[in-house]
Amino acid sequence: MEGMALYLVAALLIGFPGSSHGALYTLITPGVLRTDTEEQILVEAHGDSAPKQPVISIHDFPRRQKILFQIRVDMNPAGGMLVTPTIKIPAKELNKESRQNQYVVVKVSGLPLELEKVVLLSSQSGFVFIQTDKGIYTPGSLVRYRVFSMDYNMHRMDKTVIVEFQTPEGVVVSSNPINPSSVLIRHYNLSELVSFGTWKAVAKYEHSPEESYTAYFDVREYVLPSFEVRLQPSDKFLYIDGNKNFHVSITARYLYGKKVEGVAFVLFGVKIDDAKKSIPDSLTRIPIIDGDGEAILKRDILRSRFQNLNELVGHTLYASVTVMTESGSDMVVTEQSGIHIVTSPYQIYFTKPPKYFKPGMPYELTVYVTNPDGSPAANVPVVSEAIHSEGTTLSDGTAKLILNTPLNTQSLPITVRTNHRDLPRERQATKSMTATAYQTQGGSGNYLHVAITSTEIKAGDNLPVSFNVRGNANSLNQIKYFTYLILTKGKIFKVGRQPRGEGQNLVTMNLRITPDLIPAFRFVAYYQVGNNEIVADSVWVDVKDTCMGMLVVKGASSRDNRIQKPGAAMKIKLEGDPGARVGLVAVDKAVYVLNDKYKISQAKIWDTIEKSDFGCTAGGGQDNLGVFEDAGLALTTSTNLNTKQRSVATCPQPTNRRRRSSVLLLDSKASKAAQFQEQNLHKCCEDGMHENPMGYTCEKRAKYTQEGDACKAAFLECCRYIKGIRDENQRESELFLARSDFEDEFFEEDNIISRSDFPDSWLWLTEDLNEPPNSQGISSKTLSFYLKDSITTWEVLAVSIAPTKGICVAEPYEITVMKDFFIDLRVPYSVVKNEQVEIRAVLYNYADEDIYVRVELLYNPAFCSASAEGQRYRVQVPVRALSSWAVPFVIVPLEQGLHDVEVKASVRGELASDGVRKKLKVVPEGERKNIVTVIELDPSVKGVGGTQEQTVVANKLDDKVPETEIETKFSVLGDPVAQIIENSIDGSKLSHLIITPSGSGEQNMITMTPSVIATYYLDATGQWENLGVDRRTEAVKQIMKGYAQQMVYKKADHSYASFVNRASSSWLTAYVVKVFAMAAKMVKDINHEIICGGVKWLILNRQQSDGVFKENAPVILGGMMGGTQGAEPEVSLTAFILVALLESRSVCNEHINILDNSINKATDYLLKKYEKLQRPYTTALTAYALAAAERLNDDRVLMAASTGRDRWEEHARTHNIEGTSYALLALLKMKKFAEAGPVVKWLIDQKYYGGTYGQTQATVMVFQALAEYEIQIPTHKDLNLNISINLPEREVPLRYSINYGNALVARTAETKLNEDFTVSASGDGKATMTILTVYNAQLREDANVCNKFHLNVSVENAQLNSKQAKGAKDTLRLKICTRYLGEVDSTMTIIDVSMLTGFLPDTEDLTRLSKGVDRYISKFEIDNNMVQKGTVVIYLDKVSHSEVECLNFKIHKHFEVGFIQPGPVKVYSYYNLDEQCTKFYHPDKGTGLLNKICHGNICRCAEQSCSLLNQQKKIDLPLRIQKACAPNVDYVYKAKLLRIEEKDGNDIYVMDVLEVIKGGTDRNPQAKARQYVSQRKCQEALNLNLNNDYLIWGLSSDLWPMKNDISYLITKNTWIERWPNEDECQDEEFQNLCDDFAQLSNTLTIFGCPT
């Protein structure tokens, strides 16, 4: 009777019908609720006027075990029976580790009917932004950043933020918590060994890391330019049908505002997909005059490159422009890309078009017309077809069309086209869509249309909002008011009502636009008809992006707004909201020339914030519920009107001078060609008279003609004719040198203070506006500072965050800094040690008079230059008014590191002067190479005794450049052991498990079990959204029904059988206990006495003294027992019942005193049997029972019973799944997460979704095991590694501790050594150690292995006239000769020529080689990027295998680079890339280079006069003693010249030290050979002869310590006199000299130098 009574009660509860009331109760919430955020919701009682006090409560989902928030409100007629309580869901109460969506239940009680809505939850509670001080950095520099944080009300928020820095490869190298209230500014140090590319700074809230904000910045080597270049195409597109040439205007301005004089090189091309196809014939040199120039792409040049222009439609044109200053000192490369090649010049888009229309009511459509590059197209007429409407686009490219829709139609096709009068109809742009009719509720025909017709809306406006209704008269008469909600940033901002008078079909209200509604809002309105129908509409409204508050940066006075001097004092004034915190930074505008993509702006702020809108359309909806859903709202009513359950917070995304000889030559060519009247022969003659770059004879050239014998004859005749004329012509060149000398009229350089502080950014400050506000409510603050030394324009950017008005980015304030006379010292980012380079000091004179300037390069021993110690190098130059002059200085860096280059200049007769000191980075010679070694640290597998110790052997670096550093970087990254498997079983496929229980005591449990386990799994994995969150209520009802029905089969002693009159079953009773215990975790109404009664019966009636459980009455339906039936039955049954007891422990431990004892007895029994078990199934089941009882922590027996360590197999598939599931549970209980991974994968691969009869145990266990895996894996912290790196140079090892929380943050360290070291790891988990070794390898030109090709490359000077030189500073002729080494000719061969820096190829030569009758090449392409070395790619149809074939063309130098690095030339087969050969070429190194003396890779400057002291007259003994005893003289020797050697362009004099007269640094040199190194040019001046003796001494600075001895340099400071031999000393001519030498030797040897 008791069981039947419970069943009836449960049935009544489950089947209680919904009550019918005369009112409509409504609950509306945001479609997504945010944690820790105040949210407004709406509760309304329509048709009920009785005061009420509803209780709004928030519960966890799915189990509803916690009340997260609760509030009671007053609902009364005075408030319109409408309340808008504010709720707040605390994040601390939720599962932070869950990887699934989380939901809450919003419940309203205290009304005649309860309202309940399951709402998606978001843990993101605000916005966080990062600002870096600039958008581009160099290796080793400092990235400054600041963090701004605010909530969804735009209030400043001080929640902890995690900031991560990620490399371009996505590796997190830094992760730090920041509290924005205490630390607004932080920095991150980039190492020298840093990845180039785009980095990320990612900010996210500590408790909601799934939402983040990312700031980007680039890392690369760069030097700031001194000017910027802007390109402006004549059109934003190339119209394919047009005939106009394409023009690009070039504007170049110095960053301090003055115009640039110079030259531009322009190359056009077409980008097809991702490949750039250059147009070589378009390469032109364009003068930049007064800052402007224009490039033109002619249509015929485009057609010559691409015959079928229609094939280019859909691709883009680009223009690559390189602008160089007149002095050649600076260069900026820019590109105008994205110029679309089109058939129609416009594109049409629909801007958030409403998907649905209301028949018979206006339909508003906003169209957006763009140019092909995506920019807005203004003043373009547009027209809609079918339903006619027309308009013209505004400046922002938009036009609003209003379509009057017809009645009684369910579909509305819409086509809009441009209506430009200059375009034919087929070239007009069109766009089509189809809108669907709004479906009224129950076909009532009631409509609401909300109209907002204003175009540009801004804060402060009064916006008219119209409510337009249509429907039957009876329905309209019931409308007393409209309820409206205003949503912004995903929150309900305001709720109100607009009254409606009787008979009004159109009602209008004014809405005040406040700053809170920026950047956009949604206006949702609805009315009720009766107590059942809701009619709704909504509209999305864009508001002009401005600050909610205000922030202005300006000069504090008119003086501060003028052009400033470097280093001057000035003031700026900040004006903004009271209490605002302002972050400042001043950035050199040159930074934005390199990269302006990442600068923070107000628009970027609002773009991010606007993404918080949970609405997904521009307004409207498919029906009344669709209106709420699409606006981002959740609704439920007392009449079961429910919006669909939302499962994602985001919206789906919808699917850029001429010589006379030249004239004569032209006349000769014309007259000769005129002799051939036929057009084809005329061209053959002309081509024969073209100069041949390769220098081939006329006869050899004729072999390449392919146009027949007549053409070849004409070609040969004309070629020989013109050769005779050319042989008579001569070329000449001029060189002009000027000098002026007025030394006394210049300002002394020692009194000039050099400018040296040139930061990219500075003024990185944070200021609080705490001053009392003025009458307009504005606070202000004045800041004083000194400007830096740069001549530029500084852009001061200010970003504020106010207490209640969010973030405001002020308009940048510019500070221009310059002088009438100054130096711009242009130095590269880095130079290579011992390689010559030219730097330029550009003198700018912005005065109205010409000036004369003296320039001095200051001496630095780290460089070899014309400036030497004690010897100034000065140059005097004239500089015209309003112009510049470049003074070149050639230097050779001799030492690695950062070294000062300093130049000073003064103006003759004036006080005007300037000085600049900059750091020049000198890097080692050779090619930078990387060696990467990866070590896996896994001490549990690879260790001994829990510790893995490994020796890392140093790399063999045989090709390292001597005396250069090795840099080794270690990076250790943890590896979370567990394999996270998202949605391991798709919850949407479990629908079949929620069924209605029925049948006998066994059948009922069989049919109840699926609902229990499905609910258990979906609760644990958070996948109800896949099945439908409403299905959980249904599942709980089915569980309760099965629970109630099972009571029928419960006996008085709490045991169970299939039928009441049948003997009680141990297994069935245990199973009921287990299932009910699981259900009790999900359903509150299961009585613990029911569970514990079964437990007590099992212990008292079925457990034996040895702990084993017996079965006296097996179940009828044996299939429901799964694998427990079969061999080893006693162990299986005992283990199964033990599992049930353990499941019930949390419920029954307080009620059954003997429970623990029973569990211990059973575990003791199982432990005795465990290692002897034969069945994999029984082993797995027993292992789980023992592990759950905390009596087993060793998985060896369990894993030994497995197959492949991932499954426990028997004869039946379901038994395999069941047994493997037990094994997985056992591994999880034992915390063997690494071993659990493969098991989980095997179970998932089975794609088993369960069933009922015959599958009960497999179903229960697989979902219980996978649910447990989902629960434990995110929360387990089984990663605790201690890593120690023992480096030879460190006394203390590097130690790192890695755990689950910091696993993905790389730990890095660097060392300069390349030696063996050891790394040891202990603890749990895995980690990866990456060792990056970077060194400089020697460049070996002769090491290039050539395969199948012979290649020779050479250069020679080309003497040209000014026209041929095309304005170039110099011209070389490049000769490339190759032969294929195979048995037949090589077809389709490519020659890749890298240009020398500063050089461009002669396109006329290349064109002649490819287009003449005598074609030598198939085609060529130019990649002209002069930031790096440009490239010419030459295509050959074949390369001969029998003879050498040569190509010859000119290359022009357009700017100086001093030391020119070799350029590679590579020839390779198109079809076989392994067949290739590379050679290098460079100009004559013996010309114009500074002299230096080198041993190995160590060089000394030798740019001084040769030693001429031995030629001095009137030298006596006192003078010799005085000079030899000078403080800086290191040694005095008598030495014999043994031999003279030549090495690296220097002379090496090998001398035998006969006598040490004055000892120095070199220890024991007597009777030993020593090397004296001298420049080759000093050989004649020294005139040293073999076997002669010499008196020689030198300075300590001229000693060169080598590995085992010392070498000596012969410089201008070296004293050398020939010491006559003994026979000569007897001659009267030499007697006095010999006596002086002997006395000098005795004096210095015996007495030393006088003090």
UniProtKB/Swiss-Prot annotation:
Query: Mind listing the GO biological process terms from this record?
Result: complement activation; inflammatory response
Cite the residue spans of the region called C3a-like domain. Answer: 661-739
Sugar-bearing residue positions: 189, 1282, 1352
Ranges for the region named Factor H binding site are 1197-1259
Q: Where is the signal peptide?
A: 1-22
Post-translationally, this protein is described as follows, namely: First processed by the removal of 4 Arg residues by furin-type protease, forming two chains, alpha and gamma/beta precursor, linked by a disulfide bond. This mature AVF is composed of three chains: alpha, gamma and beta.
Binding-site positions, Mg(2+)? 519, 542-543, 545
GO MF entries: endopeptidase inhibitor activity; metal ion binding; toxin activity
* Broad class of the protein's primary localization: secreted
Region ranges (C3d-like domain)? 992-1269
SMART domains, alphabetically?
A: A2M, A2M_N_2, A2M_recep, ANATO, C345C, Thiol-ester_cl
Q: Which residues form the NTR domain?
A: 1506-1649
Q: Which residues form the Anaphylatoxin-like domain?
A: 684-719
Q: In which tissues is it expressed?
A: Expressed by the venom gland.
Q: Which domain of life is it from?
A: Eukaryota
Other information: Is expressed in small quantities.
The family note in this entry says:
Belongs to the venom complement C3 homolog family.
Question: Which protein is depicted?
Answer: A.superbus venom factor 2
